[in-house]
A protein has these predicted regions:
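C-terminal catalytic/acceptor-binding lobe
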Residues: 3, 26-44, 57-60, 255, ...
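Short beta-strand-to-loop acidic/aromatic patch adjacent to the donor-nucleotide binding site
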Residues: 175-185
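Conserved donor-nucleotide/metal-binding helix-loop-beta segment in metal-dependent transferases, i.e.
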Residues: 188-219
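Conserved nucleotide-sugar donor-binding
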Residues: 189-190, 227-246
Length: 497
C-alpha cells in the first residue's frame, strides 16, 4: 500500500498565499483610510458648490434661459453695544413754507435744542430774524420743475418736500445715524425720539413712523405709509439708497397726492416696509386732543402734529403757551410723559385715570382698565361726515350717563424733589359746568386739586412695555387728592379689591 505523500508547508504556491493573507489587512486598512479622505474632500467640495449654486439666479426671457450669478451675501454689521444713539447723531429735515414761517417757527423753537442738527427747507427765502440762533439752519429746496405732477387735488410742493431727506443727506454731515422728517407744525419730544431709535440697528435699512388716526386716510393712502407730519425716521444706509434712486422713482408717480406717499412708493421699490412706532402722531383729527393724549399707548410720546388744526392741549391759553406748559414735565421726566395709569378710590367708588404730566380724571363709578385705555371721543374725524367707525382704533363715548362725565384736572405746575428723588405735579380742576347728578355717592367736584408723586425712571423703555400702577393715598388736605404713580409691585393688579 502506498502512502500518500505528506503535504509540505513550504510549497511555492502556499508561500504566495501566505504573503497575500499577511498584507491584505494592511491593504484593506489603507483603502478604507483613502476612501474616507476622498469622501470628506468631495463632501466639502459639494457643500461649497451647493452654496455657490444658491447664488445663481436663472431667468427665462423670450424662451432663452439666462443665468446671473448674485454676489455672495454680506454679513450684517453688528451695532456696538457701547455706542448708544445720541441726539447729535439724528439730523432733522423740516418742511416749511415762507408764507407760514413767521408763525410756525414758534413751534420749532419750543422743542429745538442747541446740540441738535437739522435744516428747515423752505420754498423761498425769508428775512433773517433775531431768533435765528434758536432755530435750525434754513435752506431753500432745489428746483423740481423737471418732475411731472398731475394730481388735480394736490399741490406740486409735495415733490419738493419728498426730496428733503435726500437733500439733507447730500449736505455730507458726519456721524449721522438717522434722518428724521417732520413739518413746521410738528412738535417733537427729542429725548423720546432717541429712546425709540436706539432700539434699532442704524446700520440696517429702517423706515420708522406711524399711520393716520383716520381709517379713511389710511384707505385712501396706505396703512403701510409713514405720515410725514407725524414724523418718520430713515436710517443712514437707507437714506443713501433712497438718494440714489429717488429722482427716477418720483418720475414714475406723477399722480400721487403728497410727499409722504411718494416716499412710501420709493420705499416699496427698495423693498423696505414701515416699522410702526405708536409714539409718532399725525393727529388727523379736529377738536380736543384730551381723549387721545390722556389714553396714550404704552410707548414713548415722540411727536404731535397739526397744532394749528386742533385746540390748545391746555385750556385757557394759546397753542404756544400750552406747549410751553408741556415742556415742564418733559424737562422733568420725558420718558413718563402722557403715560396712563388707572386706579380706584374704593371708599368713594371712583375710577381715577392719570396721564402723567398732563391730566388727572375722576369718574363716578368703577370702570375697567380695558375701557379706560380706549380714547374718549373728545375729537372729531378728519372727514366731517364720518362717525366713530371712521377712526383707525377703538374709541369710547365721553360719557354714557350724565353722572359719569369725568372731572378733569390739568397740570398747573411740577417740580423735582431731590431728597425724595421724585417729581411732584399739581393738577387743578378745569372749571366747567357739570350736569346735576342724583346718584347717592361722593361728588368729585369737591376735589379742587390733585397731587401726583412719581419717581423718575430714565430706563423705563429699556424694559418690556408695561403700564405703571397708581395708588390713591390717604390725606388730611381738604379738597385734595394725593396719588402715587410708579412701577407695579409684585402681584399688583389694576383692580378694585
Amino acid at each position: 500500500m502506498k502512502n500518500n505523500p505528506k503535504v509540505e508547508d513550504n510549497f511555492p504556491w502556499d508561500q504566495t498565499m501566505r504573503n497575500h493573507f499577511t498584507t491584505f489587512p494592511k491593504f484593506l486598512l489603507s483603502s478604507i483610510l483613502l476612501i474616507s479622505i476622498l469622501c470628506i474632500f468631495y463632501t466639502v467640495s459639494f457643500s461649497n458648490s451647493s452654496n455657490k449654486d444658491l447664488n445663481i439666479i436663472t431667468a427665462v426671457h423670450g424662451g432663452r434661459e439666462e443665468v446671473a450669478v448674485a454676489p455672495p451675501p454680506v454679513p450684517s454689521p453688528k451695532p456696538s453695544p457701547s455706542s448708544k444713539t445720541t441726539l447729535r447723531q439724528i439730523v432733522f429735515g423740516i418742511a416749511a413754507s415762507a408764507r407760514l414761517w413767521d408763525h410756525r417757527k414758534n413751534y420749532i423753537k419750543l422743542w429745538w435744542k442747541a446740540q441738535m442738527r437739522g435744516v428747515v427747507w423752505l420754498d423761498k427765502g425769508v428775512k433773517p430774524g433775531i431768533d435765528d440762533h434758536l432755530l435750525p439752519q434754513k435752506m431753500i429746496s432745489g428746483d423740481t420743475s423737471k418732475f411731472k405732477y398731475n394730481n388735480p387735488k394736490g399741490h406740486r410742493s409735495a415733490i419738493r418736500i419728498s426730496r428733503i431727506v435726500s437733500e439733507t443727506l447730500r449736505l455730507g454731515l458726519d456721524d449721522v445715524r438717522w434722518f428724521v422728517m417732520g413739518d413746521d407744525d410738528t412738535f417733537f419730544v427729542p429725548d423720546n425720539l432717541v429712546r425709540v431709535l436706539s432700539k434699532y440697528d442704524h446700520n440696517q435699512f429702517y423706515y420708522i413712523g406711524s399711520s393716520s388716526e383716520s381709517h379713511l386716510q389710511n384707505i385712501n393712502f396706505s396703512y403701510g405709509m409713514a405720515y410725514g407730519g407725524g414724523g418718520f425716521a430713515i436710517s443712514y444706509p437707507l437714506a443713501k439708497a433712497l438718494a440714489k434712486m429717488q429722482d427716477r422713482c418720483i418720475q414714475r408717480y406723477p399722480g400721487l397726492y403728497g410727499s409722504d406717499d411718494r416716499i412710501h412708493a420709493c420705499m416699496a421699490e427698495l423693498g423696505v416696509p414701515l416699522t410702526k412706532e405708536p409714539g409718532f402722531h399725525q393727529y388727523d383729527v379736529f377738536g380736543n386732543l384730551l381723549g387721545l393724549l390722556s389714553a396714550h399707548p404704552v410707548a414713548p410720546l415722540v411727536s404731535i402734529h397739526h397744532l394749528d388744526k386742533v385746540e390748545p392741549i391746555f385750556p385757557n391759553m394759546n397753542r404756544v403757551q400750552a406747549l410751553k406748559r408741556l415742556n415742564i414735565p418733559i424737562n422733568l421726566d420725558s420718558a413718563a410723559l402722557m403715560q396712563q395709569s388707572v386706579c380706584y378710590d374704593k371708599t368713594r367708588s371712583w375710577t381715577v385715570s392719570v396721564s402723567w404730566g398732563y391730566t388727572v380724571q375722576i369718574y363716578r363709578g368703577i370702570f375697567s382698565v380695558r375701557e379706560m385705555e380706549m380714547p374718549a371721543r373728545t375729537f372729531l374725524n378728519w372727514y366731517k361726515r364720518a362717525d366713530y367707525t371712521g377712526f383707525a382704533f377703538n374709541t369710547r363715548p365721553v360719557t354714557r350717563h350724565v353722572c359719569q362725565k369725568p372731572f378733569v384736572y390739568y397740570l398747573s405746575k411740577a417740580s423735582y424733589n431731590k431728597v425724595m428723588n421724585q417729581t411732584v405735579s399739581e393738577h387743578v380742576q378745569h372749571q366747567v359746568s357739570n350736569p346735576d347728578c342724583k346718584w347717592k355717592m361722593a361728588d368729585p367736584s369737591r376735589i379742587e386739586r390733585v397731587e401726583v408723586y412719581r419717581k423718575p425712571d430714565p430706563n423705563l423703555w429699556d424694559k418690556p412695555p408695561r403700564r405703571n400702577c397708581c395708588r390713591v393715598l390717604p390725606t388730611k388736605k381738604k379738597g385734595t387728592m394725593v396719588i402715587d404713580v410708579g412701577v407695579c409691585g409684585d402681584d399688583e393688579v389694576i383692580e378694585l379689591r
